[in-house]
Amino acid sequence: MMRCTVCHKPYVGPKNHYVCTYCGASIESPVDLEKNPEHLRDVLRKGSEDGIWGYRDFFTVPEDAQPVTMGEGNTPLIHTDRLGAFYGMKNLYLKNETLNPSGTYKDRFATVATTLAKKDGIKQVAIGSAGNAAAAVAAYAAKAGMECFIMLPPGAEKERAWQNMSYGGHFIYGVGGVNDCVKMAEDGEAIFGWKNMCTTMMNYPLACDGYKTIAYETARSMKFEAPDYVVCPVGGGIVVSKVYKGYEEMYALGMIDHLPKMIAVQAAGCAPLVKAFDEGKTATEKWENGDTIAFAIFDPVTFEGVTALDTVRRSGGRAIAIPDDKILEAMRACAKMEAVIPEPASAATIAAAVKLHEDGVIGENDRVVCVLTGSGLRDLKLFNDENADIPSVQPGDMDSLKKAVNHYQK
């Protein structure tokens, strides 16, 4: 049964726009945790060599559907020895989603979405996106042999577009912003018969259950001792809600003894969820004239705002906005100290954890998990000035070589 994520009333609306008609929250298909709880606990304990599909019992997917998979999931949970010590946090962890096949956590959605679409005989898919979602959907469409149309704004970063093009995606520029491109993919569904693969619960709630596996994997890596805080970047708002849902399921099954506080992070230049949280509102409003280097969370409209706000508040967490200079600082620190290059949106989670630690919210010994949702390998231009003054040395000139080495040891 489909129901509202907040008021839990049954959903009886259209099947292409899943929004609660009572409170405006997202819709879900909850797992029956009472049907065979010991089996579900066993699934969680064992984990999976098959990536997220080892947790199939926690999805609403037909039994005869063959997964379209590329080994997504089972990403490492890194205890940050150097980065944590640098910032004064002994238990700072990174859930490194950059190691998914397309370099993003969106693969957890795309594998389920494409599996469901293939089961339904879909031959074409479309998505309005300029970032991680487009990369993931294009990759899995290629794997499934589907044609993929990508609507992206003219200002989209070329590095991200090139990745999508390499998978065979067809580009169509949508005049306007990302939200206009999302609408274009949605409107085209009735005309062209493609499946709109927008990575939101209001579009594809069943596929969004793939994100819950971030929680399952993290808990297993921590021997089912739940973290005190989980820090998630927020654009549309779905990851913070679905990760928490995963923890709620484990708590209900008795696998963990407490629930983490969820921290929702946005860039200061585009922070509709943070604004709504600070003002005590239950829904977000469109953010006008935003600007940030954190392109992956540059969403003026928080599609899952009602559910995300409810999640953060129920968990005892908070929403926080981080300025671009602090995001860039965290991005560079993570690369230098942990050899992980997060995209700016992901680095924002580290910057948020640091800020909350400095403010006394997060303690020195608190267990903090930052979810790094995407790779920064497409954002390397942000490192351009790191080695701007590179010394040159002629072969055999040891004096110049010594000076060159000393140049970096100032």
Language-model features: locations:
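PLP-dependent amino-acid enzyme catalytic core
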Residues: 1-410
